[in-house]
Amino acid sequence: MGLRPQLAAILLCLLACTGNWTLGCHHGALKEIIHILNQVTEKGTPCTEMVVPDALSARKNSTEKDLICRASQGFRKFYFQHEVTLCLKNNSRVLKDLKKLYRGISSLFPQKSCNVNESTYTTLKDFLESLRRIMQKKYWQCGSSTF
């Protein structure tokens, strides 16, 4: 008997379309996020000593989705002109990269809201390095060790 051609085409399309999204592993998005994080955390990058809420604190009680959501919320503020510091206004490349990180991270696990602990603060550099470690771990868990 076999499969009807239309059904075979639909099954093939479904397989191809979902292949890279298995179990929350978004290889392309993770790779791009890690690449941007590597660039922004390079020595000499301006504005990385600015203080930001430590959105990644209290990781022991948090799920991966919670961490990614809070990281996304941390970057979201860079879209609001009144939240952008003078340093970032004068260094548009860094601001552009932070906005790319927001888009990339929020695409991993789109959530409407999550709570960010604004009682503790860290430097942007430490925040970005913590996030890079989380993203690299996620990438390696997805079965790739390019980074």
Swiss-Prot record:
One GO BP annotation is:
regulation of immune response
- By its UniProt entry, which SMART domains does this protein fall under? IL4_13
Disulfide bonds listed in the record: 47-87, 69-114
Matches recorded under Pfam families: IL4
- In which domain of life is the source organism classified? Eukaryota
Record InterPro entries? 4_helix_cytokine-like_core (IPR009079), IL-4 (IPR002354), IL-4/IL-13 (IPR001325), IL-4/IL-13_CS (IPR018096)
Name the Gene Ontology molecular function terms of this record: cytokine activity; growth factor activity; interleukin-4 receptor binding
Q: What GO cellular-component annotations does this UniProt entry give?
A: extracellular space
Q: What is its main location?
A: secreted
Q: Which residues are glycosylated?
A: 20, 61, 90, 117
Q: Where in the cell is it found?
A: Secreted
Q: Where is the signal peptide?
A: 1-19
Mind listing the UniProt keywords for this protein, alphabetically?
B-cell activation, Cytokine, Disulfide bond, Glycoprotein, Growth factor, Secreted, Signal
State the similarity comment.
Belongs to the IL-4/IL-13 family.
Which function does this protein serve?
Participates in at least several B-cell activation processes as well as of other cell types. It is a costimulator of DNA-synthesis. It induces the expression of class II MHC molecules on resting B-cells. It enhances both secretion and cell surface expression of IgE and IgG1. It also regulates the expression of the low affinity Fc receptor for IgE (CD23) on both lymphocytes and monocytes. Positively regulates IL31RA expression in macrophages. Stimulates autophagy in dendritic cells by interfering with mTORC1 signaling and through the induction of RUFY4.
Protein name, UniProt field: Interleukin-4
Phylogenetic placement of the source organism? Eukaryota, Metazoa, Chordata, Craniata, Vertebrata
